[in-house]
Amino acid sequence: MKLVLQTANIVGDEKNCLYPNRAEVTSAEELQEAVKMDHVCAEYDNDYRSKENFRQSNVLVMDCDNDHTENPAEWITPEKLDEMMPDISYAIAFSRHHMLEKNGKAPRPKFHVYFEIEPTQDADYYAALKEAIYRKYTFFDDNALDAARFIFGADVGDAIWHEGWLTIDSEVEIGTPIERNDAGRVGNVIIAGTR
């Protein structure tokens, strides 16, 4: 498995759109190093992150914040993910809020799952694939399904490398786009930029 990420030269800047550093990741140790910086999972024209500049990707990231339930027994852990997806290739890096209280909610596992996919140059297909994964695995964050999503850098522990023999895109079906109401919401979630 080889995941291609693009990293920024900064950490924690949500307004940044420049990701000039290519990281070809082939191990947990390389992932752990790459995700210390803000990063994206696609290449963009002029290294400028936007859907319109999407050039290509061979990896997509899904966010698991475990905010789908307050019952700790129902929280997704790397071990549970391994049971659900034993044959699928992916890697895990913990988020900057892993096991920390946030917005008054109890500490819980929070991590990003980096799925290897067949390379694509189609931003709409890429976003549709993220929606298809969310439909099948609804514990993932439905607010992070676009083709220009960035991830805050974090240095919070060992990454996990799960080498499988399948890619996630061979395991999900792309259907119709997720319905969003007039406020940009899926259920009770407000989509970024619609407040």
At which residue positions do the language-model features occur?
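Short proline/glycine- and acidic-rich turn/helix-capping motifs at secondary-structure junctions
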Residues: 143-160
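Generic alpha-helical secondary structure signal
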Residues: 23, 48, 130, 138-141, ...
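Signature for HUH/AEP ssDNA processing cores
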Residues: 1-111, 115-128, 186-195
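Helical (often loop-to-helix) elements that flank the catalytic cores of nucleotide-handling enzymes
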Residues: 78-79, 114-140, 159-180
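Alpha-helix initiation/capping motif
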Residues: 50, 95, 141, 146, ...
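Extended intrinsically disordered terminal tails
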Residues: 171-172, 177-195
